[in-house]
A protein has these predicted regions:
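Glycine/proline-enriched, intrinsically flexible loops and inter-domain linkers
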Residues: 1-213
């Protein structure tokens, strides 16, 4: 969609789609609005509660990675039949996960919609919550992108790396392993990592950033 849609309307797009977030300048100010859309069907299928948290955190990371302070989210929740106990259970746990993450990160859900009965015959789709997030950049000149700027740039990892591969593309597509839980979410660490990265971007100490998801 983003390859076909005219994303340069009025010439205010300063970071095009395809990165962590798209960014649009606000006319007459130094401010800019960042936006991202994320989903987590595989994680939610493996563990709906954790998957719900994951998709909110993914949006949170994508906005922060361009230098935007996350402001609010909307959602589109796609599930199978609510008359099926398993599908309804997935829905309840996923919504709980979204709520817990949004509340802790102070990243409120301001709108959304639910789509049930997404199925073929009696088999429902994987639980698929989609999150649209928006964030604010106070000075668009401080916005950053994910690409390296110089040959000798130093690469830093913010946060813990625990080597989790269950439910990853590598596990599913290379190892053909479909079982196992998604990565655990530590909301305290998510918030602290995000705030740290925003401070680094605002101070001009880093030139590029990209989330690891």
């Amino acid at each position: 969609i983003w390859q076909q849609y005219d994303h340069t309307v009025m010439g205010d797009t300063i970071q095009k789609p395809g990165g962590d977030s798209g960014v649009v300048r606000v006319h007459g100010t130094d401010k800019a609005v960042a936006a991202s859309v994320d989903s987590s069907a595989v994680y939610c299928w493996a563990h709906p509660l954790t998957g719900g948290k994951q998709v909110v955190c993914e949006s949170f990371r994508n906005l922060i990675s361009v230098g935007a302070k996350p402001v609010a989210i909307t959602n589109c929740l796609n599930f199978g039949s609510p008359e099926n106990e398993e599908s309804m259970g997935e829905f309840v746990e996923c919504v709980q996960g979204i709520g817990e993450a949004a509340k802790y990160l102070k990243f409120p859900v301001v709108s959304g919609n639910v789509s049930f009965y997404n199925q073929t015959k009696d088999e429902g789709i994987k639980p698929t919550p989609s999150i649209g997030g928006v964030g604010l950049i106070k000075d668009y000149k401080k916005m950053i992108t994910m690409d390296f700027k110089e040959i000798d740039n130093i690469v830093l990892v913010i946060g813990k790396t625990e080597g989790h591969i269950d439910q990853s593309l590598f596990a599913r597509n290379i190892l053909d392993e479909k079982n196992g839980p998604p990565p655990e979410i530590n909301l305290f660490n998510e918030k602290n990592n995000g705030e740290t990265l925003l401070k680094l971007i605002d101070s001009g100490l880093i030139k590029s950033a990209h989330d690891v998801s």
